[in-house]
Amino acid sequence: LIFSSLTSVMPRSGGDYVFSSRILHPFLGWLESWTLVIASVLIIAFEVPLVLRNLQISARIIGIGAGGFHGANTWFTDATGTITGTPGFIASIIVLLLIAVVALLPTRTFHRVVTTLAGFGVACFIGMFVFGLLFTHRGSFIANLPRYTGGVTSAHIAQTGVKSGLIATSSSGFFSNIFSTTVFPLMLSVLLFQFIGFQYSAYIAGEVRGNVRRGVLIALCGALLIGVLANSVYVDAISSHFGFNTQVSWGGSYWGFNTSLTALPIGQPNSMPLLAVVANSSLWPLWFLISLGGVVFPFLLCPVYINFISRMQLAWSLDRQVPEWFGNVSERLRGPLNAIVATLVLTGIFLFFQSYKDLPTFLATTGHKLNLAGTAWFSIVMAILTWTLPGFNAILVRWRRPDLVRNAPFGKALPWIGLAWLVFPLWIYIFAVIKPIVNALKGGSALTYLETNGIIDAGIFYLIGIVIYFVMRYRAAKAGVDEKMLFTEIPPD
């Protein structure tokens, strides 16, 4: 509601950067968008290995159903069995080059390709939900699983979750869970990580034609609806279908939370199509096709992120937040080519540090490099302004910039909508981010905690963003740019 309302009166590419820089302050708008760019590039670096992992899983599904592909678990891996080192880096760069091919398509072609791939991915998601529940049974899954795990049973996997403290042995009331200051905010922070990017349509609003408010609102609500169904309803339903405690323990082992299950069952995370082929191998072609949707979705997210990042960078260049050449629009692409290339290069750098142990200890999340869990947490910390400033914009816009929202939809309700929204990110960041940091600083492992969770890395990028802002403001002032006028007006269409 906030994005669709503000986009209606400020229909420009750049999204919340444009809103925050005009409503709050140019510095806050810059820092919010700078940290969102870093968070989004981290997400791209997070998604690329997942594309490779899902290729492995797809091959394993064929192997379980029809035979062969016994070595799929070692594809793209080094001696440790993880997608890292030189094999992982080379494979990741190949995926990044394919992402670049899509990201560098002319705008109309880009959106046609993205729409087609998204349609395929959503169809696979629906197919897994419907056919997975109809054509598989928990009893078959439990009976067949030991054949593919070297004798490890579903019950044993579930028990390891209890031993590691991942599975609760006592239950609390609904409201005590909702207002928990421990696990619930942590899980919500992970969920916010999944949802970064839903605001894509608001960030390309300068390219939306027709009824901007309606188009952006439908696109945003549609993205959120799919996100809720995919991350909550779908996952919970399928997990409960195959045994909830087993799935939580299995997934916890993949992400490093279940220390009692060191060997990953089947050598893979508990992908839904993989669970389905264990339960009913006769339908392996169906599960394989659905698994390809799992390859497409993380791949698809990457060029979409690059596209909306480039539109933010275009808005930066128009506001002299970065050199003007950064936002030069290519006639062929109808988009800022230099910004897209810069984003791809930065992603490649992060992929390098995910693959090789070349980071100083204080910057590494584990073993002198970034790991996937550390990358995710790093991104969550970087996104704090992205999740909070829209609420402050909604609360303050009628007082700070009444000229901009005189005719805005939901204008009178915006302060209340913003206040209601702020409850969620503030609750999450206070108890899932700030509280653990404070506790770590009080304890004896403060430096280790700050290193392994990417907090130090995030602090460095915040500092880099601040330095860039003041350097560019100095350059703009020296060039005689009227900054007050610049940030009073919205960027040109």
Region locations from a protein language model:
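Hydrophobic transmembrane alpha-helices that form the core helical bundles
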Residues: L1-S92, L96, F299-I309
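Membrane-helix boundary/coupling elements in multi-pass transport proteins
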Residues: T35-R53, F195, Y200-A205, S281-E324, ...
